[in-house]
Amino acid sequence: MKNRLLILTICLIATIKMMAQEFTLHGKVVDENNQPLEFAIVSVASQGKTAVTSLKGDYSLKLHSADSVVVKFSYIGFKTKTKVLRRPRGKQTLQVVLREASTTLDEVNIKGEKIQSDQIQELKTKDMKMTPSANGNGVESLVQQQAGVSTHNELSSQYNVRGGAFDENSVYINNVEVFRPFLVRSGQQEGLSVINPYMVDKIGFSTGGYAAKYGDKMSSALDITYKTLKAKSKKPVVEGSLAASLLGADAYIGLGTQKLSWLNSVRYKTTSYLLGSMETKGEYKPNYLDYQTYLSYQPNKRWKLDFIGYISDNHYNFEPEDRETKFGTMENVKSFRVYFDGQEKDRFLTYFGTLGITRQFTANTSLSLLGSAFYTKEQEKYDIQGQYWLDETETSENLGVGTYFEHARNYLTARVMSAKLMLKHKVKKHQMEAAVSLKREHIEENSVEYEMRDSAGYSIPHNGKDLYMVYSLKARNELNANRMEAYIQDTYRFSGGTADSTGNRQTHYTLNYGIRMSHWNFNRETIVSPRLSLAIIPANHENTTLRFAAGLYYQAPFFKELRDTSTVNGITIASLNEKIKSQRSIHFIAGYDYRFKLGDQRYKFSAEAYYKALGNLVPYSVSNVKVVYYGQNECSGHAAGLDFKLYGEFVPGTDSWLSLSLMDTKMKLGGKSIPLPTDQRYAVNLFFTDYFPGSKKWRMSLKLAFADGLPFAAPHRELETNSFRATAYRRADIGMSYQLLDNSHREKKTFLKNVMLGVDCLNLFGIDNVNSYYWVTDVTGQQYAVPNYLTGRQLNARILLEF
């Protein structure tokens, strides 16, 4: 009996001692306005414990006591806060206030990790600063590296998403949709993107299943938010930068007071140095210049005024001289030589402006009136004659000699004005948004194009009088239309299940549902688009998120899709088809996110499966970046695939990722099933950053792309003849940068905050990627597809000054 009593006493003492070594930490995480922050991360690295705050900002952790316990609180867009508990016992309560992180230049300083709870993924812009890029458009280059996104032209900022065309991607800046030039047909003509990376605060991007607020496009949504500078005292905040490279120069300056934020940027780009590496030699004179300003004025907590102004003047002048291209197989190499006369002169002038007034009625309710105006005047003019020779390389046998002449006088003017009334209201677990907008569209086009060759494209005996017109088009059109759009959506965040003893083990749900409607008086069509998405963070699996989305998406027709053609006496006439209907895509998406740590580095693995049922499609062909539509709803189809992405700190303090995309697309046209023109069966992208051992002043950035080639056929043929596929797109860009000065962490500040030097090797392995094909016919009538290659290996030097 005494032995039993002794054993019981020892066990009781041991239990009490063990209980004394544990304690419970609970509390709440809020922002500066005392609003709860849901899904904030509370972690104790020394004990490997992590908790995610509830919808009310509450958290609870069971921890082991020690002399000191370090607790870290982090949330996307907010400064990370660390608290140290000294010999904690029993129950500890800790309420933490997180403050918004300041932003500098084009960098979003984020230490925490946001849990994706919808179909919009947030991209960090800090890696754009010294990343190698041939097109100079940092945001689009970042988007092109994402899973499900592809590009086959390093000179272009355009991209395809899950089998969609370039025109199926919507872009918003501060809740206002922006437009791209209409007449651009090649990456060489493209200038600077309207998105200015120096002004960007947040980037949201979705490859499908996005909410009702994101317009009538059926492939992707890119949501850009510009930053504002705010002084903490009466002393103004000033920041700026100067950047220069062999491809252009940029200047940026920002001013912030307690009420006013004013950002300004001037950018200049020239690609003549880069284009000099192409096979077509000549005098390239591309010059692109733009200016952008963003003014935000908030006199008090109730009112806010925002203005964005943008002017862009892009010139592309080109006088070709000659080219020589070798193509074919190792056993059968052919040579294609051309000597040119003539020139091309293009100009793209664009004005864009937005004005927004916001009334904040309460902390949870606001009403905004947004107005915007877009104007573009574009001209494309060229007269180019080429005399070509097609030869067998080994035997020197001449397969064809000919002359061709290409002529174009294309003029287009477009004006789009819009007004939008937007209401946002938050009540308990609901975050609602509704808007109605009116658009006025006016477009005028006057185009003449033709191409002719002697002797039907090859040299044979003839009477000297006949010229064969390969292609001839005339278009004189005017569009005047009004478009009305409206949407309403709600984001409902709630928790389910029974909480455990910590009060924190519940399943978290984020449900977004909404409906969108629009009417266009040109074709008198009304479309309605319901959309739904759900994200689940399971109890006891807080590092896992399951995502599901479905919705009906329409591609509302605009000017390009309207152009229908008819041929009379060998001349093709383009007119606007008033009977055209919106293309339709039904999205079904299932996604999986898993967050984990290896050592001290954070990683995230994401996977998505999708299926898109396509209907009312308007067939189109792609040459370079020019998309030509058939102008009629003629086919249906599908796109299905898998996207994988591994993201994290492969090297401490840096962000890197690897993505893999697998896809299958088909459309049924003329009773035949064929791939979509953007069918890319596989794509692999790698973005990797690293520091030199022992020094963070030296940094390396590497971009790798390996993607399947796209289907193609001879020009001016039916799409059913798309029986060929281009070679795979393979490219590697590497950049090395050295931080000459880093004054950001010094107590005594100087005028210059950061100085960085860099050198890039673009197309590191010198791979000849095919952009498009030029078709030549020999004396036997056999056609040859002569590849038009993109840029070769080239070096670029850069310098960046920040103050």
Predicted regions and their residues:
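Short, acidic, small-residue-rich periplasmic hinge/interaction motif at the N-terminus
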Residues: 30-33, 40-45, 72-79, 88-132, ...
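Periplasmic N-terminal accessory/gating domains of Gram-negative outer-membrane beta-barrel systems
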Residues: 79, 86, 92, 115-169, ...
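Transmembrane beta-barrel wall of Gram-negative outer-membrane proteins
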Residues: 238-268, 281-319, 344-369, 373
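Surface-exposed extracellular loop regions of Gram-negative outer-membrane beta-barrel proteins
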Residues: 273, 321-326, 539-588, 609-629, ...
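Face-selective signature of the C-terminal outer-membrane beta-barrel domain
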Residues: 298-314, 343-523, 606-609, 657
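Membrane-embedded beta-barrel scaffold of Gram-negative outer-membrane proteins
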Residues: 366-372, 579-633, 638, 757-762, ...
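Gram-negative outer-membrane beta-barrel transporters
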Residues: 493-496, 610-613, 630-713
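C-terminal beta-signal and adjacent terminal beta-strands/loops
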Residues: 653-656, 705-713, 738-803
